[in-house]
Amino acid sequence: MELKLHIIKSIQAAIAAGKAINTVYHSEDFGVEYKSDTSPLTVADQKSHEIIMNVLQDFDIPILSEEGKDAPYAQRKDWQRFWVVDPLDGTKEFIKRNGEFTVNIALVEDGRPTLGTIFVPDRDTLYFAAQGFGAYKLEDGPFDELQHAPANSAEQARILLGQIVEQSTQLPIEHPRQAALT
């Protein structure tokens, strides 16, 4: 039951963050700054991060976010469960205005991902998968269950991921969604 609540909250966080990203995306100024590693940081990155942190802080689970404070390894090495967040994955693509950016949220337990949520704001498309629940896509209507083969080992998962990467240049998105998610 607890995982179900995590799924719901991760979806709510991703969609709310994506809507904030889209507001900035369709504005004139992204407020681009550069981090110490010279990667770009926009107002959309910051707003998305704040929204996700506000939604997920209801749980007593640490959050490791690309835009958050650095948690030293000495602190996080003992985390049994934690959120991994990239509030705006593809900031360079966001700046190019090509629509190829996502909000990514994952829950890791005992070193293994148990939940993953990806929202594509420009296409209004949501993907999520959770251990014991399957994998789903939401675009233009109800959730569609995605077909997947079970990975029996880390090696099988690595091989499968390699095949997907070789055959794909972008997320499997057919058409932009017309109506906003509610």
Positions of the model-derived regions?
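Residue-level signal for inorganic ion chemistry
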Residues: 21, 45, 56, 91, ...
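Conserved protein kinase catalytic core
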Residues: 72-73, 92-95, 126
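Glycine-rich active-site/cofactor-binding loop and its immediate structural neighborhood
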Residues: 81-122
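Acidic beta-strand-loop-alpha-helix segment within the catalytic core
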Residues: 106-182
